[in-house]
Design a protein with these regions (language model features):
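Short, well-ordered alpha-helical segments
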Residues: 2-37
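C-terminal structural segments of small proteins and small subunits
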Residues: 49-68
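Flexible glycine-/small-residue-rich
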Residues: 13, 42, 63-65
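Compositionally biased, disordered extreme N-termini, encompassing classical targeting presequences
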Residues: 1-2, 68
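Short, conserved loop-to-beta-strand elements that form functional interface hotspots
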Residues: 38-46
Length: 68
């Protein structure tokens, strides 16, 4: 039986929440192996001069632990 772990990370993008999620997953793929899914926990944005300056997405990344 496999054992999984969840790691929460925050991705950011100047363009969209979708890009922020994509950036979070791309970053997670650089250091985590065996990613099986993601859950978008929260979306928020930084505002400057009355406009969205940065889209942010908090994401739970689920991955299977090796050797289990």
């Amino acid at each position: 039986m496999a054992v999984a772990r969840v790691s929460q990370i925050i991705g950011a993008s100047p363009h969209s929440w979708e890009d922020a999620v994509r950036n979070a997953l791309e970053r997670a793929n650089r250091t985590l192996r065996g990613i099986t899914g993601i859950e978008i926990v929260k979306e928020n944005a930084a505002v400057e001069s009355g406009k969205i300056a940065e889209f942010r997405a908090t994401v739970n990344v689920t991955f299977v632990l090796e050797g289990t």
